[in-house]
Amino acid sequence: VNAISARHVSKSYDGKVMALKDLDLEVPQGGVFGFLGPNGAGKTTTVKLLTGLLKPTEGECAVFNLSPGKDPREVHRICGVMTESARMYGQLTGMENLIFFGQTAGLKQDDCMQRAGELLKQLDLWDARDKKLSAYSTGMAQRLSLARALVNRPQVLFLDEPTSGLDPESSQSVNELISELAKNVGTTVFLCTHQLRYAQDLCSSYGILNRGKLLASGDFQTLSDDIGCHIKAGFRLPDGDMLDGFNLENGWWQTEVLREDEMPKLLKQVIDDGHSVYEARLIKPTLEEVYFGYVERQEVRE
């Protein structure tokens, strides 16, 4: 079952410029899907379309086969959203905010209290539960915003830069919670970010969006193979020594290999050819390399 699907979805705010162009996307249930792109790429527009806050100019989208345009109430019931526009009430305490939004989502009072308590403890906000939100630091407010998105135990969680403005410790606890939701609870997490290293650590699949166009989607292996980013074998040799058929990058003689298990044979061959090897390692492609590979391909084609 696909948690999220979009078919030929386009969106224009003014009838002239397309903020999103012909989006075709399928996100399977479970796992963390990283929706990658710079500011202005169309990530927030996509989230607003999928959660029923905007209607597409063309095409249709669905969340667990529900139409956000036709069944917004049902979509909101199974979704949690943490974006900059999802505001809370400064005059209410952290606990009161969560209870209010829990009841708005249809939870009973007792269930709200229990769920709010669980989340405040998980996100290290329990001691601040009776403080007004206006007295929270930026990081605390950010974590409360995540708790708000989770209060109704959503099947799909939409997150927009969830660790922005958090200190490293808070970021780690948020990331652990996101991973746990995907692995143990089966929540589908749709994570919008432009932080590529962060996304590589957390996500199981990706979509690459640039200038309103989806350039590719899939797991890391699929994307890196498609764009031609492969594993490289790297050797560090004495100064002045060189390897034929290898490229020298950052002090390492490198060549592409198809599989990791080719490395021992290649190392033996280099040594048998009379080279002294100070160090040998496999250099795996990064999400950054894959991402910029797609962006450069788009620029060449356009």
Question: Which residues does each predicted region cover?
Answer:
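Short, charged/small-residue-rich alpha-helical element at the C-terminal edge
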Residues: C229-Q298, E302
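Conserved catalytic motifs of ABC-family nucleotide-binding domains
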Residues: R153
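Conserved ABC ATPase "signature" region
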Residues: I99, Q103, D110-A128
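ABC transporter nucleotide-binding domain
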Residues: E176-L258
